[in-house]
Swiss-Prot record:
Function recorded in the entry: Component of the cytochrome c oxidase, the last enzyme in the mitochondrial electron transport chain which drives oxidative phosphorylation. The respiratory chain contains 3 multisubunit complexes succinate dehydrogenase (complex II, CII), ubiquinol-cytochrome c oxidoreductase (cytochrome b-c1 complex, complex III, CIII) and cytochrome c oxidase (complex IV, CIV), that cooperate to transfer electrons derived from NADH and succinate to molecular oxygen, creating an electrochemical gradient over the inner membrane that drives transmembrane transport and the ATP synthase.
Keyword Transferase attached: no
TM regions (residue ranges): 40-61, 86-106
Protein name per the record: Cytochrome c oxidase subunit 2
UniProt lineage: Eukaryota, Viridiplantae, Streptophyta, Embryophyta, Tracheophyta
């Protein structure tokens, strides 16, 4: 029991936990960049908080009305005016430069991805199409992914987060995800992967990811698309050497039965 608890405490956090205040563990370079940017900005915020708090406390302590019944009137100070103009201008620059760099890297499109998956949102399930396995227009590797009802959950599965068919992808491989809806606006968002792509009716949006470690990653629709709008997304990253057999054993029989 102790070993099991130790494993749970050191295992990567790839799904939301009760009372969780921080980020989920990063599984892609994009998510790691988001976390690093957050920490860098938070560092500047702490410095500003300490500096402003010190000035405020010092002013309240030294310029109390009991110590200075007649306050000194200062109507102009060139030095302080220059400093309070320059420093607030420099700080946003330090924040903006890495922010724009991360933003452009997240919006980058792969010219030749190793694999393409199409995610089609419905009310309230998803259809996934592995475009690279399409042999013809009539026959394609396509399957539906539904939320597992709480009464059908097995031991170890998360309520409101588990699906019957997961999206299986190879780890450490450049992937392209094409997102589109079949009815109303949806969204394809997985926090551990650092992706959130809106599905707009009549449009095809795409994102590029590269999952750096094996694991199961949970997400949910982040658009209010109806009663069950938070229907989940489950991405399972497997080793590249096992990916072919995993797809042929799990996904292809399911599509054949459908």
């Amino acid at each position: 029991m102790k070993l099991e608890w130790l494993f749970l405490t050191i295992a990567p956090c790839d799904a939301a936990e009760p009372w969780q205040l921080g980020f989920q563990d990063a599984a892609t370079p994009m998510m790691q960049g988001i976390i690093d940017l957050h920490h860098d900005i938070f560092f500047f915020l702490i410095l500003i908080l300490v500096f402003v708090s010190r000035i405020l406390v010092r002013a309240l302590w030294h310029f109390h009305y009991k110590k200075n019944p007649i306050p000194q009137r200062i109507v102009h100070g060139t030095t302080i005016e220059i400093l309070r103009t320059i420093f607030p201008s420099i700080i946003p620059m330090f924040i903006a430069i890495p922010s724009f760099a991360l933003l452009y890297s997240m919006d980058g499109v792969l010219v030749d991805p190793a694999m393409t998956i199409k995610a089609i949102g419905h009310q309230w399930y998803r259809t996934y199409e592995y475009s690279d396995y399409n042999s013809s227009d009539e026959q394609s590797l396509t399957f539906d992914s539904y939320t597992i009802p709480e009464d059908d959950l097995e031991l170890g599965q998360s309520g409101l987060l588990e699906v019957d068919n997961r999206v299986v992808v190879p780890a450490k491989t450049h992937l392209r995800i094409i997102v589109t809806p079949a009815d109303v606006p949806h969204s394809w968002a997985v926090p551990s992967l650092g992706v959130k792509c809106d599905a707009v009716p009549g449009r095809l949006n795409q994102i590029s990811i590269s999952v750096q470690r094996e694991g199961v990653y949970y997400g949910q629709c982040s658009e209010i698309c109806g009663t069950n709008h938070a229907f989940p997304i489950v991405v399972e990253a497997v080793p590249s050497k096992d990916y072919g057999s995993r797809v042929s054993n799990q996904l292809i029989p399911q599509t054949g039965e459908a």
